[in-house]
């Protein structure tokens, strides 16, 4: 088997002996991948993306300038657009009934997902949306919204009142 550095000369692998990249994987220039990470066949990873250690990246599409922190599971069919942040320990799911009918989440450009969150099958997280740490996302999140909790709900904006 060809060494990772030879297959992907423009990618930085941290401790490549402890990383497995299966066949038919595309990884963009300037991407960095942490140790103990598995990248499954068919995965497409954009340029200047960072994937932390202990991640499982299934057949999915990850955009440019994405940051996926340590211990994340990105399931088959997920689409992560450009400039997304995925906190440590985030899990995406793609099968509601465990019957093989896949319906993966989509995470739109500029979204930020707090650590330990779970994104259920078929969910769309809108552009620039923010998911609070530890949230369970069961419904689509509109662009620019902030949701927190289990089940994730929109936050209420609190504004300081001013007196004259």
Predicted regions, residues:
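Left-handed beta-helix
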Residues: 14-17, 21-23, 28-29, 34-35, ...
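Long, charged amphipathic helices and adjacent flexible linkers at domain junctions
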Residues: 1-8
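Conserved catalytic-core motifs of eukaryotic protein kinase domains, centered on the activation segment
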Residues: 95-98, 123, 157-159
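Conserved beta-strand-loop-alpha-helix hinge in the C-terminal portion
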Residues: 143-164
């Amino acid at each position: 088997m060809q060494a990772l550095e030879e297959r992907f000369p423009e990618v930085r692998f941290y401790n490549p002996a402890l990383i497995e990249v299966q066949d038919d994987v595309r990884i963009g220039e300037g991407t960095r991948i942490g140790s103990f990470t598995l990248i499954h066949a068919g995965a497409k990873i954009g340029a200047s993306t960072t994937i932390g250690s202990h991640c499982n990246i299934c057949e999915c599409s990850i955009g440019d300038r994405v940051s996926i922190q340590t211990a994340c599971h990105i399931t088959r069919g997920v689409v992560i657009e450009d400039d997304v942040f995925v906190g440590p320990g985030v899990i995406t799911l793609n099968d509601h009934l465990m019957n093989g009918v896949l319906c993966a989440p989509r995470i739109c450009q500029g979204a930020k997902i707090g650590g330990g969150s779970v994104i259920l099958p078929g969910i769309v997280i809108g552009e620039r949306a923010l998911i609070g740490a530890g949230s369970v996302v069961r419904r689509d999140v509109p662009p620019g919204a902030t949701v927190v909790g289990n089940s994730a709900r929109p936050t209420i904006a609190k504004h300081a009142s001013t007196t004259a």
